């Protein structure tokens, strides 16, 4: 498996890289969080567009993305609009979802773009092609906030993402018990060991699944998400706590 190199960050090589989400509603707060991220011990920054109060103004989003990028320095920027069906904050039609993304690819500033696996496949494949031509890396993803699918299904979804030309394949699932957490970790190890040609990102959400966020280097997950202020998903740890855990596992692996 080859690492994905974005600016100076090598995703899929060494310890999992830490991503910090920006989940502020206003432009002022978004820019403040972007500036603050320069001093955080993180590797990438994700701007969650579905939290932004003016996301329906595509021109404004593009302009704001450029300002965010400027404030990040050498830290790569991942742009994500998480739909409500996969745990996002805002109702948004699929038509607007793709229209926003196309506008960002043409006029915005970003290094990576998050696209949901189960979005319209024809529209998604067109967007993937367009983004790759612009030098943007694609994170294909799936989030299940209700349950943990079987190990076979988790692996199948990750392989489907890879076949659709994802640069990074991501899945997040909700455990109901400890066995579900083990299912996610086993699926991660199976995918990483037998099938992955690109970096994969997996997590079991909530308090129960927290262990999956700090053991990526043991099972094969290349990114982990840590909060600076407000968490963007259940079970997310603060950046510093996350970094300390990653160092501990690195020293003892």
From Swiss-Prot:
SS bond list: none
Keyword Mitochondrion attributed: no
Alphabetical GO biological process terms: 3,4-dihydroxybenzoate biosynthetic process; amino acid biosynthetic process; aromatic amino acid family biosynthetic process; chorismate biosynthetic process
Active-site annotation: 143 (proton donor/acceptor), 170 (schiff-base intermediate with substrate)
Domain of life: Bacteria
Entry keyword annotation includes Protease: no
InterPro entries listed in its UniProt record: 3-dehydroquinate_DH_AS (IPR018508), Aldolase_TIM (IPR013785), DHquinase_I (IPR001381), Type-I_3-dehydroquinase (IPR050146)
Reaction(s) this enzyme catalyzes, per UniProt: 3-dehydroquinate = 3-dehydroshikimate + H2O
Classification via Pfam families: DHquinase_I
PANTHER family attached to this UniProt entry: 3-DEHYDROQUINATE DEHYDRATASE
NCBIfam families found in the cross-reference section: aroD
Family (UniProt): Belongs to the type-I 3-dehydroquinase family.
Record-given protein name: 3-dehydroquinate dehydratase
Source organism per UniProt: Enterococcus faecalis (strain ATCC 700802 / V583)
